[in-house]
Amino acid sequence: MTVETITPQTPVSLPKTAVICNDFKLDRVNEPARSILEKYSKIPSREILEHVRKIRDEAFAEFPYPCIGRFSFLDLSISQSPKYPEILHRVVNGEKFLDLGCAFGQELRQLVYDGAPSDNLYGSDLHNGLMHLGYDLFRDVSTLKSRFIATNILEGNSDLISQLSGQMNIIYSSLFFHLFDWDQSLVIAKHVLRLLSLQPGSMITGRFVAYRDWNFAKEKLGSTLRFYFDLSSWTQLWKQVEVDTGSKLNIEHWEQSDNMLTDNGIGGYMLCFAITRQ
């Protein structure tokens, strides 16, 4: 196992989306997370729920993100993606995969559980503390060969970019892009593209919370608006990346149901995407 600690050059505070979720109750651990914890991590079935609660409480005390408070890291969204069979096949056959904003590295454990060699997997997050807790959550500190790098992706000279530039065949990012405004997202998108292999078919995929109509959401929510994209602006972002970098990209999108989101009258939904080099 390798976790590289890097101090971000620009201080980054917790996002405004961090709300109080400390009282959220977890009554059971669903599949596929339960099987991974039982069969991969070798945690007795009767101990799984208490084990997960303990790790969540420890993480939430330091990193009070909603996705931690609400145990969303147990959803393992990558397995629900229509791209997952392709991702798994490619990684099993030697391609390199990066989870950007990986938190505990739970999506990496899904891939390993399904047969991917862990030394083809990379994870990155702003907080190395979360990645360290991932070893406690999955009890694999002595067996996992994946490499983790703590970094601020807004920094163009970060170790993540300098060490892995052009090496990643697949980059996955879940519940990440909605934390940033247009200008920040444009910077991040270009930095992520630098990490991606120049080989056609190299792919950036993932999901984030978006609005069906951002202007409508802005009108309804005003200063309490939490997220920054609808489908139109997301597509425009990557069209701008194409212009600025001279890249040719295929942009796909689809919707994914999610337990975190309810119909509150403003049209929030889980926007999934795949950006592929042509």
Curated annotation (Swiss-Prot):
An example GO biological process term is:
novofumigatonin biosynthetic process
Q: In which pathway does it act?
A: Secondary metabolite biosynthesis; terpenoid biosynthesis
User: Which controlled-vocabulary keywords does the entry list?
Assistant: Methyltransferase, S-adenosyl-L-methionine, Transferase
The source's domain of life comes to Eukaryota
Q: Which SUPFAM superfamilies match?
A: S-adenosyl-L-methionine-dependent methyltransferases
Q: What class of enzyme is it?
A: transferase
Knockout mutant characteristics: Completely abolishes the production of both novofumigatonin and asnovolin A, but accumulates the tetracyclic intermediate asnovolin I.
Known EC number: 2.1.1.-
**Positions contributing to S-adenosyl-L-methionine binding:** 125-126, 152-154
Q: One GO MF term, please?
A: methyltransferase activity
Reaction it catalyzes: chermesin D + S-adenosyl-L-methionine = chermesin D methyl ester + S-adenosyl-L-homocysteine; asnovolin I + S-adenosyl-L-methionine = asnovolin K + S-adenosyl-L-homocysteine
* Assembly and binders: Homodimer.
The free-text function statement in the UniProt record for this protein reads: Methyltransferase; part of the gene cluster that mediates the biosynthesis of novofumigatonin, a heavily oxygenated meroterpenoid containing a unique orthoester moiety. The first step of the pathway is the synthesis of 3,5-dimethylorsellinic acid (DMOA) by the polyketide synthase nvfA via condensation of one acetyl-CoA starter unit with 3 malonyl-CoA units and 2 methylations. DMOA is then converted to farnesyl-DMOA by the farnesyltransferase nvfB.
UniProt record similarity statement:
Belongs to the class I-like SAM-binding methyltransferase superfamily.
UniProt name for this protein:
Asnovolin E/Chermesin D methyltransferase nvfJ
Provide the gene name from the record.
Answer: nvfJ
